[in-house]
């Protein structure tokens, strides 16, 4: 590839620069004995390198801001929580701070990659980082250009400057949340990061940008995993972190398209990424063989306990965080589609980890209830995926990905509903959380439920109406434990379920008020208290 003139970014051309290094070169750099602090990588007995991201073991959404200017003023969803505005002055100050940090580096890594498998909609993204394992992370997670594509890469569509070693000393006077920052400038098409080492800020940053650009073109942008069967039947799994997107889409009977971020255009479903980013807390070979086997050379583990002999301890009791992760190139999964795209989706599955044991393991949705539950995006926030979350709490996340939405939720709902109607797709709400036994629904039962959705046997099953929640559930399904499909049966006292269900229904109803009066036609498709 042609040498990049760093001076246009304010970075000295005298710094040693490594362009799109090989996995072998990244491996050597990560385990270099001269590495200090969180730059250090540890070789594990699997061949994968493990790193520690410090105190930032998850994203920091409260430190995420977007420059408010003529381009973004009337397009960004300025909700004051997810998308918070900053001035151009603050941006300029913190970009200077980031560039100064990068100018102190002995060596920089430049990774030119693609975000999106479709040539006409993909973003060319340039990552400029000073930590070898961060270069490894984006090499795993984004689409790796061929040598020919690198030679003809040209100018990037977006540039990410990662200054994780610096912090913002002026954050209080600037009215920001803390000394760390994750900022976006859609006019300059740049992201800057300071103070946090967590690699997921780069991954989710570019997802947020695709969530801005693609729906404006009529393309659905989705926080989901996706796979495809032998007959070309595509299933999409929406869900927040920890609900099972990665685990359930890695199905040995089907081919993986991707595990987290996808678009849906006139040609079908396509992946934004070139890798997977799986949670590994309490990982077992029996329950998640594909992820287990993907942890080998070129995979990158985060915050996993490594014993003195190099063996890994995935157990919750041994881990510093519940958000232990591994990134790996998608070709570490045996059954994949390359390039990572397929036809139009037929099955839309909304995953929820209900911590309160109220939702059924599976509910069959119609067109309106599908839109209702997509806009609500109910789950329970699970420990570790964000700073400050240590216990499960009920959460409503529009589009099952509120933290990454840059446009109003209804824009995503409208585009998805249009695609589903055009291609006769059906939707289901699947609870991967808990029931009245205070135990989590087993992965074996959930997989059997997914099988019933895919093979459509769920459509033939007799349905039961669940009051209050206003949902229809199958009476029985092959391979699913008896007595769990109706959540009321998991309680020794049905009155306890009813009390919890009314409490959750009230939360649904209160949450949906934000979509009124426009969404009034959907109210009858949600939970009811009268």
Curated annotation (Swiss-Prot):
SUPFAM superfamilies, sorted: PEP carboxykinase N-terminal domain, PEP carboxykinase-like
InterPro entries on file: PEP_carboxykinase_ATP, PEP_carboxykinase_C, PEP_carboxykinase_N, PEPCK_ATP_CS
Xref: Gene3D superfamilies: 3.90.228.20, Phosphoenolpyruvate Carboxykinase, domain 1, Phosphoenolpyruvate Carboxykinase, domain 2
Catalytically driven reaction(s): oxaloacetate + ATP = phosphoenolpyruvate + ADP + CO2
GO molecular function, one term: metal ion binding
Ligand binding (ATP): 204, 223, 239-247, 288, 325, 440-441, 446
Keyword Cytoplasm included in the entry's annotation: yes
Pfam families, per database record: PEPCK_ATP (PF01293)
One GO BP: gluconeogenesis
Subcellular location(s) per record: Cytoplasm
UniProt superkingdom: Bacteria
Pathway: Carbohydrate biosynthesis; gluconeogenesis
Entry's cofactor comment: Binds 1 Mn(2+) ion per subunit.
HAMAP family: PEPCK_ATP (MF_00453)
Entry similarity comment: Belongs to the phosphoenolpyruvate carboxykinase (ATP) family.
Protein's recorded name: Phosphoenolpyruvate carboxykinase (ATP)
Organism for this UniProt entry: Azobacteroides pseudotrichonymphae genomovar. CFP2
Gene expressing this chain: pckA
């Amino acid at each position: 590839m042609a040498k990049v003139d760093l001076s246009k970014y304010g970075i000295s051309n005298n710094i040693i620069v490594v362009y799109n290094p090989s996995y072998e070169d990244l491996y050597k750099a990560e385990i270099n004995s001269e590495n200090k602090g969180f730059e250090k990588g540890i070789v594990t007995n699997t061949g994968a390198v493990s790193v520690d991201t410090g105190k930032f073991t998850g994203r920091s959404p409260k430190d995420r801001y977007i420059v408010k200017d003529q381009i973004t003023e009337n397009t960004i969803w300025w909700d004051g929580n997810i998308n918070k505005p900053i001035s151009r002055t603050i941006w300029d100050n913190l970009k200077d701070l980031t560039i100064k940090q990068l100018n102190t580096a002995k060596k920089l890594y430049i990774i030119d990659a693609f975000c999106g498998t479709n040539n006409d909609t993909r973003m060319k993204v340039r990552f400029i980082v000073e930590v070898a394992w961060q270069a490894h992370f984006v090499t795993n997670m984004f689409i790796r250009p061929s040598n020919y594509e690198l030679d003809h890469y040209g100018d990037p569509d977006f540039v990410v400057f990662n200054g994780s070693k610096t912090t913002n000393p002026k954050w209080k006077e600037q009215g920001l949340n803390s000394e760390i920052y994750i900022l976006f400038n859609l006019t300059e098409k740049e992201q800057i990061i300071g103070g946090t080492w967590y690699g997921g800020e780069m991954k989710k940053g570019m997802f947020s940008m695709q969530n801005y650009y693609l729906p404006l073109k009529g393309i659905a942008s989705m926080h989901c995993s996706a796979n495809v069967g032998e007959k070309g039947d595509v299933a999409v799994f929406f869900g927040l972190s920890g609900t099972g997107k990665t685990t359930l889409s890695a199905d040995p009977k089907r081919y993986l398209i991707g595990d987290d971020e996808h678009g849906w255009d006139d040609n079908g479903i396509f992946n934004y990424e070139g890798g997977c980013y799986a949670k590994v807390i309490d990982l077992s070979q029996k329950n998640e063989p594909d992820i287990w086997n993907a942890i080998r050379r070129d995979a990158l583990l985060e915050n996993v306990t490594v014993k003195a002999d190099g063996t890994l301890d995935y157990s919750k009791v041994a881990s510093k965080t519940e958000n232990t992760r591994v990134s790996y190139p998608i070709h570490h999964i045996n059954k994949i589609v390359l390039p990572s795209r397929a036809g139009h989706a037929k099955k839309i599955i909304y995953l929820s980890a209900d911590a309160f044991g109220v939702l059924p393991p599976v509910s069959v949705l119609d067109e309106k209830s599908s839109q209702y539950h997509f806009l609500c995006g109910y789950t329970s926030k699970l420990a570790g995926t964000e700073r400050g979350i240590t216990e499960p709490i009920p959460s409503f996340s529009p589009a099952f990905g509120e933290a990454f939405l840059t446009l109003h939720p209804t824009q995503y709902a409208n585009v998805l509903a249009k695609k589903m109607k055009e291609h006769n797709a059906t939707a289901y709400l699947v609870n991967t959380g808990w029931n009245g036994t205070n135990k989590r629904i087993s992965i074996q039962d959930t997989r059997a439920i997914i099988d019933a959705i895919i093979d459509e046997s769920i459509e033939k099953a007799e349905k039961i109406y669940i009051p209050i929640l206003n949902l229809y559930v199958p009476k029985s399904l092959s391979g699913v434990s008896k007595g769990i499909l109706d959540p009321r049966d998991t309680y020794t006292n049905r009155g306890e379920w009813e009390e919890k269900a009314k409490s959750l229904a009230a939360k649904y109803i209160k949450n949906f008020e934000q979509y009124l009066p426009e969404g009034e036609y959907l109210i009858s498709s949600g939970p009811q208290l009268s």
